[in-house]
């Protein structure tokens, strides 16, 4: 699960920064295994973004805030953000995206904190994607060697994603 989902997550979602880059515009993706997906999702779709310095940093981890931004752009939320109930997002770059996803039941946070600067885990990403696309987890727990390390809230989503072939 770690290798395959990590590669997908990197290719489809690894991006932070403010500048939307066009296809083939990143200085550090030429020859990268995910170059084609990065170019498509950044240039053609405009969903993922690079850094202001013209790089994409395809092997860098992604934060919870950046992932929220990607989901927000993908889902095209039109609603305005509700009042902020998170103690750690006020004035941050990702505040609006996090609040819209939270109002939609996609981004849940943790004990009053959104943790936007924390690296997103695979199980957090799977649960957010599952909630975003209303994928009903109906499958038993997955059969991975590290299943005991998957949080209870994400276990059914991981099992469902495995059953559908999204995770291996």
What are these model-predicted stretches?
Residues 2-36, 47-65, 71-96, 103-123, ...:
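Feature responds to low-complexity, polar/acidic, surface-exposed segments characteristic
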Residues 126:
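IQ-motif-like calmodulin-binding regions
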């Amino acid at each position: 699960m770690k290798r395959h989902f990590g590669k997908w997550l990197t290719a489809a979602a690894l991006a932070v920064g403010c500048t939307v880059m066009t296809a083939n515009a990143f200085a550090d993706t030429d020859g990268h295994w995910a170059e084609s997906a990065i170019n498509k999702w950044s240039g053609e779709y405009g969903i993922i973004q690079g850094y202001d310095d013209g790089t994409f940093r395809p092997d860098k981890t992604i934060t919870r805030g950046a992932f929220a931004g990607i989901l927000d752009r993908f889902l095209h939320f039109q609603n305005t953000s509700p009042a902020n109930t998170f103690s750690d997002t006020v004035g941050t770059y990702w505040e609006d995206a996090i609040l819209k996803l939270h109002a939609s039941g996609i981004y849940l946070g943790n004990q009053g904190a959104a943790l936007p600067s924390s690296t997103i885990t695979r199980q957090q990403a799977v649960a957010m994607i599952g909630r975003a696309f209303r994928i009903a987890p109906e499958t038993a727990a997955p059969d991975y060697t590290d299943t005991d390390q998957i949080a209870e809230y994400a276990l059914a989503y991981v099992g469902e994603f495995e059953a559908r072939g999204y995770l291996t």
